[in-house]
Amino acid sequence: MSPTLIRADSAFGPPVAVSMPTSEPAALVRTAADQDIPVGSTGFWECTPGRFRRQVHQAEYSCFISGEGSFTPDGGEPIAFRAGDAIYFAANTEGEWNIVETVRKAYVIFE
């Protein structure tokens, strides 16, 4: 197997409103370099400020490149993050994102 390069300067698709917003205006998301890999999928994700429910049911690892915000798991305390931080979400983690400053992250979703 050979390495897969995922370029940071990949072109992003058009922004779309999140489907489960909990604030107005709805946050906008867009992705770049989405690729299938042997364990799932990977790419870049960007989101404007706002609150919304997490919609990914698979396990996910996220490394934040820029921005800041928090994630509050259902029944838990907020987890604040900023550029340079990383979060691992176990499968079926549910909760609410609160994006304070536009966030860009690299992610791996495990199937």
Language-model segments: residues:
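A short, N-terminal "cap"/entry segment at the start of jelly-roll beta-barrel domains
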Residues: 1-39
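Short hydrophobic/aromatic-rich beta-strand segments that constitute the beta-sheet cores
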Residues: 54, 71, 105-107
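Short, exposed beta-strand-loop hairpins at the edges of beta-sheets
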Residues: 95-99
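A short hydrophobic beta-strand segment most commonly corresponding to one strand
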Residues: 88, 101-111
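Short acidic-glycine-tyrosine-enriched beta hairpin
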Residues: 75-92
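Conserved short histidine dyad/triad with adjacent acidic residue
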Residues: 35-56, 90-91
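Short, conserved beta-strand element in jelly-roll/cupin
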Residues: 47, 56-71
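Localized chelating/binding microdomains
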Residues: 31-32, 64, 93
